[in-house]
């Protein structure tokens, strides 16, 4: 599987056994100004995340691109 991976946000081949791509997003103090924080990576399983953290898992090549947000102003 090939997944987008941060910080470079480029598609990379995942290590053996990690066949899922996931996009994890969450807010910090500057969320309303800068938008959500984003982590893109490979995984063996879709992780369980704490409250207020969003995660999307998928299993096809390059299926988890960097999310786009509406302009916040």
From Swiss-Prot:
Cystine pairings recorded for this chain: 3-21, 14-42, 27-31, 46-57, 58-63
InterPro entries linked: Snake_3FTx, Snake_toxin-like_sf, Toxin_cobra-type
Pfam short name (any one): Toxin_cobra-type
SUPFAM superfamilies, per the entry: Snake toxin-like (SSF57302)
Superkingdom classification of source: Eukaryota
UniProt similarity note: Belongs to the three-finger toxin family. Long-chain subfamily. Type II alpha-neurotoxin sub-subfamily.
Task performed by this protein: Binds with high affinity to muscular (alpha-1/CHRNA1) and neuronal (alpha-7/CHRNA7) nicotinic acetylcholine receptor (nAChR) and inhibits acetylcholine from binding to the receptor, thereby impairing neuromuscular and neuronal transmission.
Protein's recorded name: Long neurotoxin 3
